[in-house]
Swiss-Prot record:
HEAT repeats lie at residues 20-54, 57-91, 94-136, 143-182, 217-256. Residues 1191-1202 have a biased composition (Acidic residues). PANTHER family: SYMPLEKIN, SYMPLEKIN-RELATED. The gene is sympk. This is Symplekin. The keyword 4Fe-4S does not apply. It comes from Xenopus laevis (African clawed frog). The lineage of its organism: Eukaryota, Metazoa, Chordata, Craniata, Vertebrata. It is found in: Nucleus; Cytoplasm.
Length: 1202
């Protein structure tokens, strides 16, 4: 539509104002973006792109350099925006490719993965744009040719990224390769063309007479890309993400370029037969599902008609139903229509393109236009040959034999991975299934390098292989050297003819014809200049003089110092790693002074310069491995470790990091590590390092473990305890346990030597020295063993074995130090119980000590008591074994063992009584003892004198009385009561009575009752007891006077003869009686008391006469009744006057002279006359049956009056 000049003029005026405002806005945004932060900068640059690309493209040339300058920005997102701007700008104006393709090449080499991925996506679009632009240029310029060379080089770089370490980069590279293959292959009638790619260029659109775009070269590039993609998908370690992307790309290629459908189907078959072993179970399921979807999409394509058999078989193996396969088959009519259209278009194309092409100066071959390839490849592959070989062999008999043979190697249960992917074969035995099985087997055989197909491929003549290999190499455009480093380069096109020497010389002399595209660089950078003409070669030797050794050394040292001092400036520029590498390489090649300078530099700040030390150390190790001596590495390692050890503050673990990162630890380095561990302030860090070495370096772990074990016998307690702590944790590991046990037992066995070996004093050899064993040296041999004992109870038997052969001094030390480990084992340890049961000869004291330790604070277990009892009764009848388990024995067993126990050492006897009385820890708790305190004291009195001497029994009773908190007055009262009931009377009865009275004087009344009962038991018949009776009467006078008056005359006379000092007080006591009371005192008693002036013989005769004289029973009873009434009256008066406090003792019987009235009446009726002795015995019987009085016996009235 024509526009008038006036309307054009006015529209230009309106546009000018708009451009000015847009331009100012762009300038403003660019200035603000240069100073803004990342987020704001990104927003502004997006606005700039919107204004320039979409609103006013005329501003593109004006602000191109300013926008491209942001490609050096530190922000990744900013650089990605620059990549996107390059794409949009080049699509808008293809001529900008000449300016911007070099910048895109730089961004393709960016250090950030995301920028590289964005650049690959941009290249996916710009490759087609560049090819279309170059193909339509008639004639193309040299700049376009150079630009296309760089685009081709970038495509080759992206192909190499298929081997990248980054999953995302590989995925983006797969997508680029897919686009590259579609672009560099002809579009046919059956090709699917996505709507968004409808206008894209393809190979058939390349002009046949183009100056440098060669049809065959581009076609071979596309085929080579197909091979690279297939090779990538067949890699055994391909990831699930990459495999999914490759499957989709191959399916897309097969639909858009049916000529490659055969290769795609074969690749799918190979993948189905050889899934990568690195995939997880869930990934395998995902890949199989994706493979099924891609096969269905390929099956829907009209060109899949020739491949429906293998595709259907694969789908059936993947679990697809036959109905679903049928639904995805292309309609026959569509297929026929497309074939007709293909034939028509093919004829037209043939008529249009079958024009002879003019000769090209660069390539003398005649170009042939593309024809639609046959569906199957013209030559058979190794897989096809092997499949043809295997297929006839798959007869039912052979298959059955193979199944039977393979069943031997099958697992008992179906593996989960196989079960999850297995699908039943629906068409088993059919011809298609046999062909499919043959191809699967052939694929696996070819991958393994076996089969006739592989053999035939090896037998191909060498000239054919060379010819096939030479052709693509000549056609592939060679890689260029980067323009940033070389300036200019000549584009080399495919050519098979070799150049002569003359032609090469001419090319060398010729100036460079084409200039490679250069990137737009920021103003602050210096643009590299191109190579000019020839220059005179500069020879350094012509202008320099040799330096002296001193100068050389000084220059070297100065250079290294400058590098060291430039640490901060180099770090700010981001070249720290390069600086470290340079220093590491330099220092290994220079002399000691330089090494000392670098070491000093490191030690000034070890934490920040650790990377330098490790780089230097590894460089020295590389030199050592390459054949140099070990001295350099040794000096470097020792220098670093020693320097770190000498530093006062080492809390950041640099020493540990160096030790753990060092590639090799020499013996000298281990010596430094040992000294580090022996420093009390660093012992934990040093031993932690040793532990990490043991766990992370299995090749020499026992050497490091030996060092840690050596420290377990260190003389410093802190070092030793720290070492034992780590060893016990190492002991939990099964692989280290035998070595640790062996070391501990070796040290334990040293105790059998007559003298301590020198190994205990730090010497290298195990030789004995003249020094005797001391407690410290004995403990050195035991520390590790005792630390392991609670963790491995079986080691206790080794201690018993060594103990039997050791000297007395060693045994004493062993007994002192085993308390903690034995307590840690516990009395329920099976090994400890076994030791008790099988106590070795000579280890009795060790076993006894163990028993004492185990039962010191807790009662013995029934199992322990059982083992000790069996040991005592069957093998070793040593009563000392029973002491620790006394509280677990029966009462009868303890009483039987008492005679032997009290004959032991006094200290041991005291321990026995402490256990029985429950007072071993200063607390009274006899609830667990089989004997009560009273039972124990009674048992001691009843010990047979033939089994134990009386002296030991007396000492034992004294121990009981020393436990005053146990033997209270109540307990003693019960004991005395039990002893009184014993027949015959115990020999030590009166001694106990006297001791009880001495401990508790308030028992006086109860004692009087005891004495009275003893008269009834005719105590004078027991000489020892009678002697004690007299002594007790002496000590308890005047309370005992009433008891003495109850004695028969002969026994009273014996008492007065034994203790004459009792006569006068007793006589005075009697004379103080009232006449009524005195009338009841027998004349014989008075005669004995008043016979002081007579001779002893006369007194005896009078006593005998009085005894023989028969007195009527009535007179005796009357006198005693009177005495009873008189005494009772006196007692009541005494209670009223003194109000004496009642004593809490056992009830006592009344004196024998007090007879109840009922007994008096019975005696009057039944008896005539009785002898005094018989009367005493009858009263004694009565007293025994009477209960113990609650009140103590009162003192005599005469004493109270006084």
């Amino acid at each position: 539509m024509a526009v008038s000049m006036a309307s054009q003029f006015f529209s230009q005026e309106e546009g000018t104002s708009e451009v000015v405002s847009t331009s100012e806005r762009v300038v403003e945004l660019l200035n603000m973006a240069a100073l803004a932060t990342n987020d704001t900068k990104i927003t502004m640059l997006k606005q700039v792109q919107e204004l320039i690309i979409n609103k006013d493209p005329t501003l593109l040339d004006n602000f191109l350099d300013e926008i491209i300058a942001f490609q050096a920005d530190k922000s990744v997102e900013v650089r990605k925006i620059v990549v996107n701007f390059i794409e949009e700008a080049c699509k808008l104006d293809n001529e900008l490719l000449i300016k911007l393709i070099a910048n895109l090449h730089m961004l393709l080499k960016d250090e950030n993965v995301n920028v590289v991925k964005k650049s690959i996506l941009t290249m996916t679009q710009l490759y087609k744009v560049a090819l279309q632009w170059v193909a339509r240029s008639r004639p193309p310029s040299e700049q376009q040719e150079s630009c296309w060379d760089l685009v081709t080089e970038m495509a080759a770089d992206i192909l190499l990224l298929l081997e990248s370490d980054n999953d995302g980069m590989r995925t983006h590279a797969v997508k680029f390769v897919e686009s590259l293959i579609v672009t560099l292959s002809p579009r046919t009638a059956d090709s699917e063309v996505p709507k968004r790619q409808d206008g894209d260029i393809s190979l058939e659109q390349i002009p046949p007479d183009h100056q440098f775009l060669k049809y065959n070269t581009l076609r071979d590039l596309g085929k080579q890309a197909v091979k690279e993609l297939l090779k990538f998908m067949a890699h055994p370690a391909i990831s699930s993400i990459n495999l999914t992307a490759a499957l989709g790309s191959l399916a897309s290629i097969a639909r858009q370029r049916p000529m490659f459908m055969a290769e795609v189907i074969q690749a799918y078959e190979t993948l189905h037969a050889n899934l990568p072993p690195t995939l997880a179970k869930s990934q395998v399921s995902s890949v199989r599902k994706n493979l099924k979807l891609q096969l269905l999409s390929v099956l829907r394509h009209p060109s899949s008609y020739e491949y429906q058999g293998p595709i259907s078989t694969l789908l059936l193996d993947l679990g697809t139903s036959q109905g679903e396969i049928t639904r995805h088959l292309p309609p026959p009519r569509d297929s026929n229509r497309k074939r007709a259209r293909e034939d028509g278009e093919g004829g037209q194309k043939k008529s249009r393109t079958d024009i002879p092409l003019p000769d090209d100066d660069d390539d003398k071959d005649t170009m042939q236009l593309p024809t639609i390839p046959a569906p199957a490849p013209s030559t058979q592959s190794a897989t096809d040959i092997t499949a043809d070989f295997v297929r006839p062999l798959l007869s039912p008999e052979n298959v059955a034999n193979l199944v039977l043979i393979s069943m031997v190697y099958l697992p008992d249960s179906m593996p989960a991975s196989f079960q999850s992917t297995y699908t039943p074969v629906e068409s088993a035995g059919t011809d298609s299934q046999i062909r499919h099985l043959a191809r699967l087997m052939a694929t696996q055989m070819s991958a393994a390098g076996i089969g006739p197909g592989v053999e035939q491929s090896k037998d191909i003549p060498v000239d054919v292989v060379e010819e096939e290999n030479i052709k693509p190499e000549g056609l592939v455009i060679k890689r260029r050297i980067s323009a940033l480093t070389k300036g200019q380069a000549i584009s080399v096109l495919g050519c098979q003819s070799e150049k002569t020497k003359e032609e090469e010389e001419e090319e060398d002399d010729a100036p460079l014809a084409k200039k490679r595209p250069e990137p737009i660089l920021p103003a602050t950078q210096i643009r590299p200049s191109g190579v000019g003409g020839r220059k005179k070669v500069f020879r350094l030797k012509e202008v320099t003089e040799p330096l002296t050794d001193v100068q050389i050394k000084s220059l070297k040292l100065g250079a290294v110092r400058r590098i060291l001092q430039a640490e901060r400036s180099v770090g700010s520029s981001g070249a720290s790693q390069m600086r470290v590498k340079v220093l590491a390489r330099l220092v290994t090649q220079l002399d000691i002074s330089v090494k000392a300078e670098v070491l000093s530099h490191f030690l000034n700040d070890p934490r920040m310069r650790l990377d330098l030390a490790l780089a230097w150390l590894y460089q020295e190790y590389c030199e050592y491995q390459s054949g140099a001596g070990e001295e350099g590495y040794q000096e470097c390692l020792i220098g670093i470790l020693t320097g770190l050890q000498e530093r006062p503050d080492q809390r950041d673990g640099v020493f540990t990091k160096v030790v753990l990162e060092a590639p090799l630890l020499t013996d000298s380095a281990l010596d430094v590590l040992r000294k580090y561990c022996e420093d009390e302030g660093r012992s934990y860090l040093g031993m932690s390092t040793l532990r990490d070495l043991i766990l992370t370096r299995p090749a020499r772990q026992f050497q490091y473990l030996h060092l840690l074990l050596d420290l377990s016998s260190h003389e410093k307690d802190k070092i030793r305890q720290q070492s034992l702590h780590f060893i016990k944790r190492m002991y939990e590991k099964e692989s280290l346990r035998p070595y640790i046990e062996k070391f501990a037992l070796n040290y334990l066995q040293l105790l059998v030597h007559p003298n301590p070996p020198s190994v205990l004093f730090g010497a290298d050899k195990d030789t004995e020295v003249a020094a005797p064993w001391t407690e410290d040296t004995v403990k050195q041999c035991l520390y590790l063993y005792l630390a392991l004992l609670p963790q491995n109870h079986k080691l206790i038997h080794e201690l018993a074995s060594v103990y039997t052969e050791a000297t007395a001094d060693i045994k004493r030390t062993v007994l002192r130090v085993i308390e903690t480990p034995i307590r840690g084992m516990g009395m329920n340890s099976p090994e400890l119980l076994l030791l008790v049961e099988n106590c070795p000869k000579g280890a009795e004291t060790l076993v006894t000590r163990c028993l004492h330790i185990l039962t010191d604070k807790v009662p013995p277990s029934p199992e322990l008591v059982k083992r000790v009892r069996e040991l005592y009764h069957k093998r070793l009848p040593d009563v000392r074994f029973l002491i620790p388990v006394l509280n677990g024995l029966d009462k009868k067993e303890v009483i039987q063992a008492l005679p032997k126990l009290i004959k032991l050492n006094p200290i041991v006897v005291k321990e026995v009584f402490n256990r029985l009385l429950g007072t071993q820890h200063g607390e009274v708790s006899s609830s667990l003892s089989p004997l009560t305190p009273g039972d124990l004291l009674v048992a001691l009195h009843n010990i047979d004198s033939s089994k134990c001497d009386m002296k030991s029994v007396i000492k034992a009773t004294n121990l009981c009385f020393s436990a005053r908190s146990v033997y209270t007055s109540e307990v003693l009262a019960v004991v005395l009561q039990q002893l009184m009931d014993t027949t015959p009377l115990p020999m030590l009865l009166m001694r106990t009575v006297i001791q009880a009275l001495g401990m508790y004087p308030r028992l006086g009344g109860f004692i009087m009752n005891i004495l009275t009962r003893l008269i009834y038991k005719q105590v004078w018949k027991y000489p020892k007891v009678w002697e004690g009776f007299i002594k007790c009467c002496q000590r308890t006078k005047p309370q005992s006077f009433s008891v003495l008056l109850q004695l028969p005359p002969p026994q009273l006379l014996s008492v007065l003869q034994t203790s004459p000092d009792l006569r006068d007080p007793l006589l005075a006591h009697v004379r103080a009686f009232t006449p009524h009371q005195l009338a009841h005192v027998p004349h014989s008693i008075m005669a004995i008391l008043e016979a002081e002036s007579r001779t002893d013989a006369g007194a005896e005769e009078a006593a005998q006469v009085e005894e023989e004289q028969e007195t009527p029973a009535q007179d005796i009873i009357a006198r005693r009744l009177a005495q009873e009434k008189s005494l009772k009256k006196q007692i009541e008066e005494q209670k009223g006057r003194n109000n004496q406090e009642m004593e809490e003792v056992a009830e006592v019987d009344p004196p024998a002279i007090f007879i109840a009235e009922e007994e008096e009446e019975e005696s009057l009726k039944s008896q005539g006359k009785e002898e005094p002795q018989e009367d005493s015995s009858s009263n004694a019987t009565t007293a025994e049956k009477s209960p113990v009085a609650d009140e103590p016996m009162e003192e005599e009235p005469v004493e109270k009056k006084d």
